[in-house]
Design a protein with these regions (language model features):
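Aromatic pocket-lining residues of Rossmann-like dinucleotide-binding sites
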Residues: 47-48, 112
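Short beta-strand "acidic-cap" motif of Rossmann-like dinucleotide-binding folds
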Residues: 55-57
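Rossmann-like adenosine-cofactor binding region
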Residues: 60-153, 168
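N-terminal Rossmann-fold NAD(P) dinucleotide-binding loop
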Residues: 41-42
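Rossmann-like dinucleotide-binding domain for NAD(H)/NADP(H)
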Residues: 114-206, 250, 265, 280
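A conserved regulatory-domain signal marking ACT and ACT-like small-molecule sensing domains
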Residues: 194, 198-281
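Glycine-rich Rossmann-fold phosphate-binding loop(s) that bind the pyrophosphate
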Residues: 37-38
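Phosphate-binding beta-alpha-beta segment of Rossmann-like dinucleotide-binding domains, i.e.
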Residues: 1-31, 195
Length: 281
């Protein structure tokens, strides 16, 4: 446009001719499938309902907090097949692990509507590239938007590659730093875990004078071993929370008495215990 303007071309006319590049379907009345209803997935689902979309969400591990935050207009799917078959648009909000890697593969794509549009700003490995490329070439998948592009994907005209834009405003950069500092302080002072990638979210209001924060493998019998060790010390448990994520679990135990170094050593020595921290207040 700069060159044409310099040559006296009517820029307004040129710009108007370019509007065909931006033609696309409207969102209102379309169905959005949201795979993963965590903090971000819930927000996306709720906003989409306000845009007039029909939203169907899937998350086999939907937390109580997420469920309470989810709009009543969002329909919860019992299985992925429902999402694949009904959605005009699909957005992914999942961690990548052995269960989710390649979740959008050949079978999933075959079950989708013709011309489906897919957004993956979660993890690149959630999409099987070997299945996605021919689907894009045939038009089965009309468009793929991702911030995990590579050379093979970017050769295709219906792929939009984005940088990671999560903290691309001055405000968000400041907020990220403040949030990280607060969450780190909360862990150091209270043992709470918030927004961890590898560990479960665990928070417990103080109800004792001593707190044990125990990282361990997600194996049976560990809680019994912890409470047995405290019972031998004649220490009563005031409150406790235990949550797991994959192979690991985290337990917070509040008591109203000092816990001896011997008891801490006993708990630390139990099978599958990885780390024990003692906090007091």
């Amino acid at each position: 446009l700069d060159g044409q303007a310099a040559q006296g071309t009517d820029v307004t006319t040129v710009i108007e001719k370019g509007k065909s590049q931006f033609v696309g379907p409207e969102l209102q009345g379309k169905t959005l499938g949201v795979i993963g209803l965590g903090a971000i997935g819930v927000q996306v689902a709720n906003i989409a309902t306000k845009l007039g979309m029909n939203v169907v969400g899937y998350d086999p591990f939907l937390s109580v907090n997420a469920a309470l935050s989810l709009s009543r207009a969002v329909r919860w799917a019992k299985d992925l097949e429902t999402v694949w078959q009904e959605s005009d648009y699909i957005t992914l909000h999942l961690p990548q692990n052995e269960h989710t890697k390649g979740i959008v593969g050949a079978d999933a794509i075959a079950a989708m509507k013709d011309g489906v549009r897919i957004v993956n700003l979660a993890r690149g490995g959630l999409v099987d590239k070997a299945a996605m490329i021919p689907a894009l070439e045939s038009g089965k998948v009309a468009a793929y938007v991702t911030d995990f592009p590579d050379n093979d994907l970017l050769k295709l005209p219906n792929v939009t590659g984005l940088p990671h834009l999560g903290a691309s405003t001055p405000e968000s950069e400041d907020n990220c730093a403040v949030m990280a500092a607060r969450q780190l302080a909360d862990y150091l002072e209270n043992g709470n875990i918030v927004n961890s990638v590898n560990l479960p979210a665990v928070e417990l209001p103080w109800s004792g004078t001593t707190r044990l924060c125990i990282l361990h493998r997600n194996s049976p019998g560990i809680i019994a071993g912890i409470t047995s060790a405290l019972s031998q010390e004649k220490v009563n448990v005031e409150n406790m929370v235990n949550k797991s994520k994959g192979d690991y679990a985290y337990t917070i135990v509040d008591v109203n008495a000092a816990v001896s170094p011997e008891a801490v050593a006993h708990i630390s020595g139990l099978e599958n215990i990885l780390r024990v921290r003692v906090l007091t207040r």
